Design a protein with these regions (language model features):
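Positively charged n-region of N-terminal signal peptides that target proteins for export
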Residues: 1-4, 19
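Sec-dependent signal peptide hydrophobic core
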Residues: 5-10
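C-terminal motif of bacterial Sec signal peptides marking the signal peptidase cleavage site
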Residues: 14-17
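Primarily auto-inhibitory N-terminal propeptides
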Residues: 23-218
Length: 218
């Protein structure tokens, strides 16, 4: 399992009430126990991270992903955003507006050259039940020296651009927190890049930003 240190920047989307949408057409959620979950045979562990001292598996949910063909899309262009927004408003749409990204269930609606496409990932620690996250096209990096930011931008030119910064590294025990927009195509690529950055000696931690639709049965 690739280790990505988990910080304090997981974004939770409270999307209550969306689970009844027929787009998702999946069985009603049952009380989860790992011992009796038949879908575990379909799971393929890819990556993970630490939450404090606890290791957390991040697993592509192959069973639902292959059966329903659901992908989460972050459009990169304004025209694409308008197109997906228009599709999501159609009565028989297979595109669901999730507020910042789109859940797409029909392949012809997500095969483009520009979108960032995330698989849905199973996360193994939330309340003992299966919960899901999608990977955002953003990587958050914590460093103690602000010069590291420039080294990262130079090494990953074309893949990362600086979006925002915070922190007070000049204070005793201080740090800098940088948010980089990630110009890649897939969640797997973003996770691998975050893992690579985390392995640097001059980086305290790095992770992809995530959305956790914990109130949506997907």
């Amino acid at each position: 399992m690739k280790k990505i240190l988990f910080g304090m920047v997981v974004c939770a989307l409270a999307l209550a009430g969306c689970g009844s949408d027929t787009v998702f057409d999946e069985p009603e959620r049952q009380v989860y126990t790992a011992e009796n979950d038949p879908a575990l045979e379909k799971l393929e562990t890819n990556v993970g991270y630490y939450y404090g001292d606890k290791g957390v598996d991040l697993t592509r949910y192959e069973f639902a992903y292959r059966a329903a063909g659901q992908y989460c899309i972050f459009p990169k262009t304004e025209a694409r955003e308008q197109e997906l927004s228009r599709l999501s408003q159609q009565e028989d749409s297979q595109v669901k507006n999730m507020g910042g990204f789109y859940l797409v269930t029909r392949s012809r609606d997500f095969i483009t050259s520009d979108d960032f496409v995330s698989d849905r990932y199973f996360i193994n620690y939330y309340r003992g039940e299966p919960e899901f996250v999608v990977i955002c096209p953003m990587i958050i990096v914590r460093v103690e020296n602000s010069e590291v930011k420039d080294k990262i931008l130079k090494k990953y030119r074309g893949k990362l651009t600086l979006s925002d910064r915070s922190g007070q590294g000049e204070m005793p025990g201080g740090y800098y927190l940088y948010k980089f927009d990630c110009h890649l195509r897939t969640s797997e690529q973003a996770l691998n890049l975050a893992d690579e950055i985390y392995m640097r000696d001059d980086v305290t931690w790095a992770e992809t930003n995530k959305y956790a639709p914990i109130h949506l049965d997907i």
